[in-house]
């Protein structure tokens, strides 16, 4: 099973600083967020220098149980109950780190309403370590990268869920508005006279830069 030590060793063995060139050499889209996610997958799978796309895909599938989607955390999960990985890019070391509607996680739990069915069912699991992999990008240049376990940086889930629950309950008690069931903080139906517009109420969790 791959782990964060394997990833660090791979970075030392084969550092890559130009993500655009790296992504292009692997015949993949060079959008920088996607390129950083690809690089993170490769350092865990040991495929940084692998140019044969079939070999690369095979090795990645041997290491990862889940490879993510655009709408739900995490970005990937290692096999055999290994860590879940969330990849984030920032533009300077002191930038705030936006987690969007997903609150910080010390651990990832299979019962979370934020994850997809594919993530939940990829293998039998209850909870996983959470790794935040944060790359500092200047254009397509990867200036630095940090990987931190969620349990070393985040509070337990009850802390965030208590606040989220209080806000969600408060929003839902507003009178004269038609609410619908949602996993977000709220959803308001029939915002306009025609009843064809709805409003999503979402949180934005942010780690403050230092």
Q: What are the roles of these predicted feature ranges?
A:
Residues 1-73, 78, 83, 89-210:
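Nucleic-acid endonuclease domains
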């Amino acid at each position: 099973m791959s782990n964060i030590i394997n990833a660090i060793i791979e970075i030392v063995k084969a550092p890559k600083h130009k993500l655009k060139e790296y992504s292009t050499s692997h015949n993949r889209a060079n959008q920088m967020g996607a390129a950083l996610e690809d690089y993170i997958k490769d350092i865990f799978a040991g495929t940084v220098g692998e140019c044969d796309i079939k070999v690369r895909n095979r090795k990645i599938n041997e290491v990862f149980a889940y490879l993510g989607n655009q709408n739900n955390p995490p970005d990937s999960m290692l096999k055999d109950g290994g860590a879940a990985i969330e990849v984030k890019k920032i533009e300077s070391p002191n930038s705030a780190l936006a987690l969007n509607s997903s609150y910080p996680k010390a651990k990832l739990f299979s019962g979370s309403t934020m994850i997809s069915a594919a993530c939940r069912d990829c293998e039998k699991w209850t909870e996983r370590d959470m790794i935040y992999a944060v790359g500092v990008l200047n254009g397509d240049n990867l200036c630095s990268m940090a990987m931190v376990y969620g349990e070393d940086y985040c509070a337990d889930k009850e802390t965030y869920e208590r606040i989220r629950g209080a806000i969600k309950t408060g929003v839902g008690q507003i009178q004269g508005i038609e609410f619908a069931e949602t996993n977000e903080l709220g959803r308001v139906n029939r915002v306009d006279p025609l009843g064809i517009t709805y409003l999503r109420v979402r949180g934005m969790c942010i780690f403050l830069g230092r």
